[in-house]
Regions:
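Enriched for short, Lys/Arg-rich terminal
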Residues: 2-9, 13, 20, 24, ...
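A short, compositionally biased N-terminal segment around positions ~18-40 that is enriched
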Residues: 17-33
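A short, surface-exposed loop/turn module that caps and links secondary-structure elements
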Residues: 28-52
């Protein structure tokens, strides 16, 4: 799993407890899945190609690269703001 600079910045702006919840989800649930799409939902429209994962009121947007077997964390934020 790789985390883009923007996503790291997004995570660093959150409260410590929210940071822990998101990192725990990424490391212990998402990264250990054989098929990460089982936990997420594909986005449509201008964000087509990205997948979203729900952690409380936060959303984690990722790009899944099957050829490299990698998950790129693109953006993290509150559900009201992350899709803008």
């Amino acid at each position: 799993m790789r985390v883009e600079k923007r996503a790291l910045k997004d995570i660093s702006r959150l409260q410590r407890s929210d940071q822990r919840r998101i990192v725990d989800f990424l490391e212990n649930r998402l990264a250990r899945r054989d098929n990460p799409r089982e936990l997420g939902e594909a986005l449509t429209g201008p964000l087509a190609g990205l997948w979203k994962y729900r952690v409380g009121s936060f959303r984690i947007l990722t790009r899944i690269d099957d050829s490299a077997l990698a998950i790129w964390v693109v953006q993290v934020g509150d559900r009201r703001e992350v899709y803008r």
